[in-house]
Design a protein with these regions (language model features):
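Basic nucleic-acid-binding interfaces
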Residues: 2-4, 9-101
Length: 101
C-alpha cells in the first residue's frame, strides 16, 4: 500500500515558510520521498503501518493550509502513467585546463 501526501501550505511570511519547511522535513524523516513538489509518497507494508504514518502526518501538519492523504494499493500504484517532459538543467561549463611547462 502506498500513501500519497499532497499539500498546499502558505509561504508568505517568514514563519509560514519555516513551518512549511519543517513539515517537509518531518515527512522525509518519516520515510516519505518527494514525488512532485508538494506530493510525497511512502510505501507501507500493511494497513496498520499506514495508519501509524497517517497519525504522524496529522501531528506534524501546520494549522494553516491544506493536506490531503491518499491510500493506494500496489495494483493501483502500478497503473500510474508518468509522462516526462524535457528537464532543463543549468549547463555547467567545463573549466579551462592550464598547461605548465
Amino acid at each position: 500500500m502506498w500513501l500519497f501526501v499532497m499539500f498546499d501550505l502558505p509561504t508568505v511570511t517568514k514563519m509560514e515558510k519555516k513551518l512549511s519547511a519543517r513539515f517537509r522535513k518531518e515527512l522525509e524523516k518519516d520515510g516519505f520521498i518527494m514525488y512532485q513538489y508538494s506530493v510525497y509518497i511512502r510505501y507501507c507494508a500493511s494497513l496498520e503501518s499506514a495508519h501509524v504514518h497517517i497519525k504522524r502526518v496529522k501531528s506534524s501538519t501546520p494549522q494553516k493550509g491544506v493536506v490531503s492523504i491518499l491510500m493506494v494499493t500496489d495494483k493501483q500504484y502500478s497503473n500510474i502513467i508518468n509522462i516526462w517532459g524535457e528537464i532543463h538543467h543549468k549547463k555547467v561549463s567545463t573549466p579551462l585546463q592550464l598547461e605548465f611547462f
